[in-house]
Amino acid sequence: MGSTAPLRLPVIDLSMKNLKPGTTSWNSVRTQVREALEEYGCFEAVIDAVSPELQKAVCNKGHELLNLPLETKMLNGNKPEYDGFTSIPNLNEGMGVGRITDLEKVERFTNLMWPEGNKDFCETVYSYGKRMAEVDHILKMMVFESFGMEKHFDSFCESTNYLLHFMRYQQPGKDGRSPALSLHKDKSILTIVNQNDVKGLEFETKDGEWILPTADNHIVLLGDCFMAWSNGRLHSPLHRVTLVANQARLSTSSFSFPKDIIETPAELVDEEHPLLFNPFEITELLAYCFTKEGAKAVCDLKQYKAYTGA
């Protein structure tokens, strides 16, 4: 018998021509998005809102940022998860640029890293962040429509912040596969990742199998906050990064987070779907992730509920 073909994530075309609300193509993509987020919690996305030139430019800016002296990068340290400088020596380092759709905030971050200014960095990451936030907005709109929750959409989006995160992984120095980022779930609403042509991201299915998406497309994944909002109808997937020898990697990830409280709408609670999570604040969830209990639980929202009664 032949070998079983490797599992593949759904590939969804998010080209702007398909993203006009009310059209047949919109409705088709909306169905695909809902089904993928229910079954896998993630999918590969063909996105033309960001040109190859802009994607390459923002990747270069990520390297430029992470090439700064350690003492400079530490000026943006001691921040919540994703927003700030993090480093695991000889493995990876990352930096988040918060409030990426607010030009004034991006300028402030840029001036912190480069007191003499760096207009090109500021303009590039702001442009990229805005375009990715637009895609994120469209995806959330599709999800809300699919649940018949349009009346809650505007207030939900008004309570959303966007963040751009660069993560650079050192080239493994040994043969075979090498773990580069441990198993975890994102705490975001949505995350949109670009691997910049180097594979590494892996997702665990509900059945315990592993899927390795291609490095050709963006990858959209659902975070615990959106899972909680949906009352468990959407799936927040476990994932990790594993690299092979002779491959360095830099990823760019666009996150959307609630500004404060995440709460399940009453319309999504019924006898068949009892309330899974009480309202909780994102800052408290992120703080839990850094406790001993949170680290042991791969920062899982269900363990957070048991720990806090949320």
Swiss-Prot record:
Transmembrane segments: none annotated. 2-oxoglutarate binds at R249. Pathway: Aromatic compound metabolism; phenylpropanoid biosynthesis. This is Deoxypodophyllotoxin synthase. Fe cation binds at H184, D186, H239. Belongs to the iron/ascorbate-dependent oxidoreductase family. SUPFAM superfamilies: Clavaminate synthase-like. It catalyses: (-)-yatein + 2-oxoglutarate + O2 = (-)-deoxypodophyllotoxin + succinate + CO2 + H2O. PROSITE patterns: FE2OG_OXY. It comes from Sinopodophyllum hexandrum. InterPro entries: DIOX_N, IPNS-like_FE2OG_OXY, IPNS-like_sf, Iron_ascorbate_oxido_reductase, Oxoglu/Fe-dep_dioxygenase_dom. Mostly expressed in leaves and stems. One of its GO terms (biological process) is response to wounding. Induction: Transiently induced after wounding. The keyword Lipid metabolism does not apply. Its EC number is 1.14.20.8. The lineage of its organism: Eukaryota, Viridiplantae, Streptophyta, Embryophyta, Tracheophyta. GO terms for molecular function: 2-oxoglutarate-dependent dioxygenase activity; metal ion binding. Binds 1 Fe(2+) ion per subunit. Combinatorially expression of Sinopodophyllum hexandrum (mayapple) genes of the podophyllotoxin pathway (e.g. DIR, PLR, SDH, CYP719A23, OMT3, CYP71CU1, OMT1, 2-ODD, CYP71BE54 and CYP82D61) in Nicotiana benthamiana (tobacco) results in the production of the chemotherapeutic compound etoposide. PANTHER family: 2-OXOGLUTARATE (2OG) AND FE(II)-DEPENDENT OXYGENASE SUPERFAMILY PROTEIN-RELATED. 2-oxoglutarate-dependent dioxygenase involved in the biosynthesis of etoposide, a chemotherapeutic compound of the topoisomerase inhibitor family. Catalyzes the conversion of yatein to deoxypodophyllotoxin. Can also use, to some extent, demethylyatein as substrate. Its cofactor is Fe(2+).
